[in-house]
Amino acid sequence: MILDKIFEKTKEDLKERKLKLPYDMLGRSLASNPFFPKDVIKALKRVEKEVKIIAEVKKASPSKGVIREDFDPLSIALNYEKNKATAISVLTEPHFFKGSLEYLSLIRRYTQIPLLRKDFIFDEYQILEALVYGADFVLLIAKMLSMKELKKLLEFARHLGLEALVEIHDKEDLSKAIFAGADIIGINHRNLEDFTMDMSLCEKLIPQIPNSKIIIAESGLENKEFLEHLQNLGVDAFLIGEYFMREEDEGKALKALL
């Protein structure tokens, strides 16, 4: 499965990064240049019919290959912010998504809205990295973590002042997210194991999610009417990447969905 390949490669990369910059040194770099994360819960919680979009900076994906040839992460991020994105998701996985932590750091320097580090996170070191490079919240994929691991990473993120978007794809993932104490739950219409899409997933899972949780819909979103349908089901915000990346003007495409 592709998820297993990505996970293994991420573990190799992390081992190298830890050798180059041990945990204590990474922590000291934060102490010398403190960063105070933004209130992600407040930003993402929907108010009436307001459309909230986490717009993604993504060059490639394992299922589609390179999506955006003329890829300028900062220009894209600034265009998103100018066109009223609620937050920006930054891919930092380098091999399959062609992302980088440097993109996250660069975008943080020039934007004011919350930033999501989107990667395959399974270690506290990666969460500390996210804070050092300027993220306000991190992605945690329920499918690739045990209940104990998910809970531990959630608690560590909060200890650092970060939030976590816990991504789910089925009832088992949802149970894991709820029992681990997730406040932000992302329902991914795309199955990460075979890339098939189930656009009815929100309808199936939202009735089982407590009202206190913030719900994010992910993948396959490119139609304003469908976004309104999902809002009526209880979705607070939408994470959209590939659709924007395929458009000539990603900011204009974003604005059209608001």
From Swiss-Prot:
GO terms for molecular function: indole-3-glycerol-phosphate synthase activity; phosphoribosylanthranilate isomerase activity. One of its GO terms (biological process) is L-tryptophan biosynthetic process. Its EC number is 4.1.1.48. It catalyses: 1-(2-carboxyphenylamino)-1-deoxy-D-ribulose 5-phosphate + H(+) = (1S,2R)-1-C-(indol-3-yl)glycerol 3-phosphate + CO2 + H2O. Pathway: Amino-acid biosynthesis; L-tryptophan biosynthesis; L-tryptophan from chorismate: step 4/5. It holds the Pfam family IGPS. It is an enzyme of class 4 (lyase). Keywords: Amino-acid biosynthesis, Aromatic amino acid biosynthesis, Decarboxylase, Lyase, Tryptophan biosynthesis. PANTHER family: INDOLE-3-GLYCEROL-PHOSPHATE SYNTHASE (PTHR22854:SF2), TRYPTOPHAN BIOSYNTHESIS PROTEIN (PTHR22854). Belongs to the TrpC family. This is Indole-3-glycerol phosphate synthase.
